[in-house]
Structures are given as structure tokens and as C-alpha cells.
């Protein structure tokens, strides 16, 4: 029931009224975070701040635990993760943010690759569990601190701090979910069909994709492959021929083959969604 409530609240959060960028530039003018804020990110993941011409956006004002958690849940859902509970509608201290964010990231598999020492001198009142979660955030460059030696754990989290922190979380999630691959080759033909073929070898998975184009002259490559909830999504970079270039009106096919290392993938079956193809083919 909690998970359903969370999903409903995120849907409401994303369906807030029309968003414009009218006043955010004014409110960030001269602010230390001006160059760090991605306006599109704010509009998408913090729509309650962007609503009505960013009327609720005040960089140095505090953000509630519920608003922060809803934005975090919305971000997680974009990477096929989820969690229950949306927090309390009260102030959120920086150490409580560490507890909430660190525990959620730990649950989805983020870990400390190096046991780097935390430099902050004002964390002696934090529990040992919270300090380990802080280490996780610090090691992954999600939380840097008020200064090189100060975290200010008891201070309430501000709107602009929440935005910057979740922007860094997005970068971490992107890295966690990106699958490295090797392009083996691409060929063009005039007699084929759109399809996706998956072949398993001892240590590798070979994926062959064929896409139809209305004329020759198109280029096709894979931009990235991302892990999803029950498989992987392949994102393509497709460029049409130059508009002033004469092309015969002949249907052509591009067949692209990529290689993925099994040890970087989850357990089979290997399900792939082709971005733009609207189909899923599994092995």
C-alpha cells in the first residue's frame, strides 16, 4: 500500500501545472550555485518548486523531508528503482538527508570502492551507521560538505543543496546502469527485415540489430546501453542524410552487431528494449 501511495504522489508531482523558466534566472542571479543548477533538472524532478513560474523556488529556503524524498523517488523510478515511504512533511536536516539518501543508494547496490577517510570534523554526534552512509556519499562525490572540514549535520537542507545533491545522484545512477559494449561491425543491405538476435557465447553476449530506413544515407550507432528493471535498453544515435543530398527512394537496412561481457550483465534471460523500435525480444 505504501508503494502504491508513493507512486500516486510521484504522478501528482509530475503532473503539476505548466512550467516556465521565467524567474529562476532572477532568483539564482549572483547566487553561489547559479552555474551548478540544471534548469531542466529542476523542472522535471522538482516541479513543485517550478510550478507557477518558480514561485516556490527560493534557493536558501529549507526543503521538507517529503519533498526531497518524492524527488528522490521520481529520480529512482527513471532508473527502474523504487522504494516505499515518502517521508514526513517537516524539516530535513543534513544528517537525516545522509541517512535517507545513503540507505536508499546502499539498498540498490552502490558501495564504497575505496575506504577514503572522511575529512569532516563536526560529525562526532552522528551514529556509526550514519557515518558509514556519509562515507558512501562522500566517496561517490555526492556530498562534499559545507567546506573541506565541515558538514554542518544539524543544519537544515536547503532547496538549492537538495537540487545539486540529486543532480550528482543522477550521474551516479547513470554510471551504475550503463553497460559497456564493443561494436563489432555494421553492414548495409537491401533485402532484410527489422529484427534483434541474441546469441550467447561462453563469456559474451552478441546482440545483432537490423533496422529499416526509407533511403540510403542514414548512419546508425549505439549511444548507450542501460540496465532496466527486467533487462536492458539500447539507445540509438541515428542521423538522416543531408537534406540537399539526392538519394534513391530505396528501402535499406542497417545491421549492427555489438558484444557485451557476461560478467557485466545480470543473470539471464537477456531482455532488450530497442529505443525507437517499440518492441522487446528476449533470448
Each language-model region and where it sits:
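Feature responds to low-complexity, polar/acidic, surface-exposed segments characteristic
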Residues: 4-38, 46-66, 73-131, 144-159, ...
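Active-site-proximal beta-strand/loop segments in catalytic clefts of secreted hydrolases
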Residues: 71, 146, 237-239
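Exposed, flexible binding/inhibitory loops of compact, secreted disulfide-stabilized domains
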Residues: 21-23, 34-35, 41-42, 109-119, ...
